[in-house]
Amino acid sequence: MSSSLGKEKDSKEKDPKVPSAKEREKESKASGGFGKESKEKEPKAKGKDAKDGKKESSAAQPGVAFSVDNTIKRPNPAPGTRKKSSNAEVIKELNKCREENSMRLDLSKRSIHILPPSVKELTQLTELYLYSNKLQSLPAEVGCLVNLMTLALSENSLTSLPDSLDNLKKLRMLDLRHNKLREIPSVVYRLDSLTTLYLRFNRITTVEKDIKNLPKLSMLSIRENKIKQLPAEIGELCNLITLDVAHNQLEHLPKEIGNCTQITNLDLQHNDLLDLPDTIGNLSSLNRLGLRYNRLSAIPRSLAKCSALEELNLENNNISTLPESLLSSLVKLNSLTLARNCFQLYPVGGPSQFSTIYSLNMEHNRINKIPFGIFSRAKVLSKLNMKDNQLTSLPLDFGTWTSMVELNLATNQLTKIPEDVSGLVSLEVLILSNNLLKKLPHGLGNLRKLRELDLEENKLESLPNEIAYLKDLQKLVLTNNQLSTLPRGIGHLTNLTHLGLGENLLTHLPEEIGTLENLEELYLNDNPNLHSLPFELALCSKLSIMSIENCPLSHLPPQIVAGGPSFIIQFLKMQGPYRAMV
């Protein structure tokens, strides 16, 4: 039985700020990056589009996702709901725009089915935003807007575009995301001034050879379509900086991709890639490479020539080894994700290969040992995720990992943590859940910066008194162990907001628990020997969630227990010696 004991807080969403033209230009040059995947939301005023992929990894892992299609900004309509505009209202907007000689018109979220032909009179327009309407087609008259530089048509039901758009000789940005296109309209290939083309989330199956007619393209996003191959002519896009082909059906890349030497961001995640061409090594400007969720079994040695590479994501492939010295050659690499592959050993290359790495994710492999000294030069390594491997012990130099901030060793076969864990003085997050730990080292108390400690599903019978020194601790998870008591020092953890004690053998809670003034969540469920609760618990004034399922609590009146956590807290307040204080 769990209960919410607190009051809901009012929250107000701030209106998005209207971006200036200068900000929009700056944003259009930006590319995305690795990060956690998130669900795509309906674009707000900034038109942000950040959906990325299928799965998430653990909270403590380094970045694993890669998204670049998030750079559109547009003027700010009133936030919130879609406006319903009659044809007359739209015409009124068009007339107002003409009379004021405005260069920018935003008709987004108006439920527009048909754009009036009178739009042709707005020849001064440079920006036209029609996001999130119900357009199935555009009138040919849009082709009269010869000064148009930005045309944003995302989230409509377009199946084609009029040929008259080839009159838009100044058009630089075309946004066709979230429509119903089955092919790239032929007129698009004639818009040779385009620098930015968004075609995300349509039903496109092919990219034609005519893509070569768009030599000024610096951003091409065709993610989330049904594309099975790219034409060799993609290599003629020599100004391409960002290429996003994620979530398609590619099995191979054309070797001509190596001609796109200006590319800094290449997102190929969630395809069916079986290999990479050796020419990928020609991408000397490449900064981010996303290859997660493909079918790769090997990485070409030529990738070592991509010396500008900072982020490499190879999650969920069939890779068991990397070319020797590959990582040592990538002298700017700071984020490496090798999770969900077939590694049984660390990559060959010695300590130098991790000298620039800030974040390393090796989750869900078959590694049974971290080599001694492998991180001896890893002076900036802050995040290490070794979750779900086959580790039985930690290396003797474990205590020298002084730069570590987040360490995830969950779901291994560790039976002990070395005493020299005390050397990890920068550690803020330590995840040790689902191991075989029976006790914790006294040196744990030296981790004074620790904010989160997860020890769920081990075999702990007690906690060291030194845990009282972890005064910055906010989250402590001890669920599913064999604890019968807690040290009195638990009361020193005054910053604790979450305390998980479910599925243990607790017989009582120490009265010092009442000093946890910031405690918001307390989980006591499934403690079959817990017959009472201390009156001091009523002093935890911020407690909003308490779980007591399957706890006998026989020392409390049955009718109080039956009422649930809120009744119990009220009882402790009213009957205890602290009633004047709460």
Swiss-Prot record:
LRR repeats lie at residues 101-122, 124-145, 147-169, 170-191, 193-215, 216-237, 239-260, 262-283, 285-307, 308-329, 332-353, 356-377, 380-400, 403-424, 426-448, 449-470, 472-494, 495-516, 518-540, 542-563. It comes from the Eukaryota. One of its GO terms (molecular function) is protein phosphatase binding. Residues 1-29, 36-57 have a biased composition (Basic and acidic residues). Its main location: cytoplasm. One of its GO terms (biological process) is positive regulation of neuron projection development. The keyword Nucleus applies. Component of the SHOC2-MRAS-PP1c (SMP) complex consisting of SHOC2, GTP-bound M-Ras/MRAS and the catalytic subunit of protein phosphatase 1 (either PPP1CA, PPP1CB or PPP1CC). SHOC2 and PP1c preferably bind M-Ras/MRAS, but they also bind K-Ras/KRAS, N-Ras/NRAS and H-Ras/HRAS; these interactions are GTP-dependent and both SHOC2 and PP1c are required to form a stable complex. Interacts with PP1c in the absence of Ras GTPases. Interacts with M-Ras/MRAS and RAF1. Interacts with ERBIN; disrupts the interaction with RAF1 and Ras, preventing the activation of the Ras signaling pathway. Contains a N-terminal RVxF motif that is important for interaction with PP1c. This is Leucine-rich repeat protein SHOC-2. It comes from Mus musculus (Mouse). The lineage of its organism: Eukaryota, Metazoa, Chordata, Craniata, Vertebrata.
